[in-house]
Amino acid sequence: KELKQLYPSYNLIVYDAARPMSVQKKMWNVVKGTSKFKYVSNPNHGGGLHNYGLAVDISILDSLGTPLPMGTKVDHLGFEANITQENELVHTGKISENERQNRILLRTVMKKAGFRPLPSEWWHFNFCSRDEAKRKYKLIP
């Protein structure tokens, strides 16, 4: 709804949302012991909000159904995906100003819808905190 008010021909695309803990364990086994472990929630510590169905990996499609450029692909496990360093990323040529503006648009519409961005992943948004999820919701096995 928020996106349609600003850009009627744009759409959101969901890449990942609810994730069973069984899948989380497989993902963790791929990254544990590597430099990429920090990008995947450890299932031994309760997993993440995807495991409660309370997180979404999302982007924006233009009027032709093409994803807007965001500087990296979804699930890029690296510094360029970070939202807190976007000015530096533009300054050093890692992402363009247009890509930064597209990220800002995504954050704007998702925040208006009640979601919070994850600083290390421009595509990831949480609906609530992990503590709130643990109190109110059940894990997806």
Briefly describe each language-model feature range.
Residues K1-P141:
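Cell-envelope/glycan interface and biosynthesis
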